[in-house]
């Protein structure tokens, strides 16, 4: 069994009173970089606004966060480097990230012209530009891309149930990988491409699972009493970081 370490945080956002802030109270978002060797966390940005979902840039020089539907670049020292150009896609949510080769950015975003809540998946050049829509159906939330860059995996609501699906980065057939009742979410490929890690509520508590890349042979990886979400596998394929709610 692959070892899962819940205490490791590569980058994190802590937020105070994010949802439905009462009148007179403020939303405070904080961005940290945590050094795994020293165990020290460095606060690089704290502001009175809602921002979230930091992702390392392919060259490691900045972090990409989202705020109010836009994607912003923040240097590792906390300097604001401006918005990333995402063309007409201007209502991004917190599900975005880069391909393994660093050439492509995947974005999940609503369409303002559709009144009900939506989320579609797009791809765009890592340096920005006009995105191309991948998934035709909503709601679809991007979470991972295969190491060879050919397929994306994502969480999608189909027939009032959230499961994990796979599709070519160029669009096409939607392949269902999970079919359990309740939420299956957060799919991410292992660096060797053999496994997809997910978090699933199939046991009654959100836990980390992994399955073969074709969705077969699901295997539970965490067994504690706490809800565990979003496994991110280290490049060495030996450890993972997860979010645990205690």
What positions do the PLM features span?
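Asp/Glu-centered strand-loop micro-motifs enriched in Gly/Pro and often flanked by an aromatic residue
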Residues: 42-48
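Hydrophobic alpha-helical segments
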Residues: 16-17, 49, 113
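Residues at the start of alpha-helices and the adjacent loop-to-helix junctions
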Residues: 4-11, 46, 88, 141, ...
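Bacterial Sec-dependent N-terminal signal peptides
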Residues: 1-21
């Amino acid at each position: 069994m692959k070892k899962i370490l819940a205490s490791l945080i590569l980058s994190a956002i802590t937020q105070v009173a994010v949802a439905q802030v009462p009148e007179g109270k403020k939303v405070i978002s904080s961005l940290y970089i945590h050094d795994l060797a020293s165990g020290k966390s460095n606060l690089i940005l704290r502001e009175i606004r809602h921002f979230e979902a930091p992702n390392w840039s392919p060259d490691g020089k900045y972090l990409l966060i989202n705020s109010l539907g836009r994607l912003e670049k923040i240097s590792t020292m906390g300097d604001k480097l401006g918005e990333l150009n995402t063309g007409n896609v201007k209502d991004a949510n917190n599900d975005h990230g880069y391909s393994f080769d660093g050439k492509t950015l995947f974005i999940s975003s609503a369409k303002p012209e559709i009144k009900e809540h939506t989320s579609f998946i797009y791809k765009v050049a890592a340096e920005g530009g006009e995105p191309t829509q991948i998934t035709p159906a909503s709601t679809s939330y991007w979470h991972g891309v295969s190491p060879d860059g050919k397929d994306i995996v994502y969480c999608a609501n189909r027939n009032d149930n959230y499961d994990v699906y796979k599709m070519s980065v160029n669009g096409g057939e939607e392949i269902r990988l999970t079919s359990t009742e309740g939420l299956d979410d957060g799919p991410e490929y292992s660096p060797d491409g053999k496994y997809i890690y997910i978090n699933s509520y199939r046991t009654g508590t959100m836990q980390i699972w992994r399955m073969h890349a074709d969705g077969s042979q699901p295997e539970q990886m965490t067994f504690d009493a706490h809800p565990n979400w979003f496994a991110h596998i280290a490049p060495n394929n030996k450890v993972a970081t997860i979010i645990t709610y205690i």
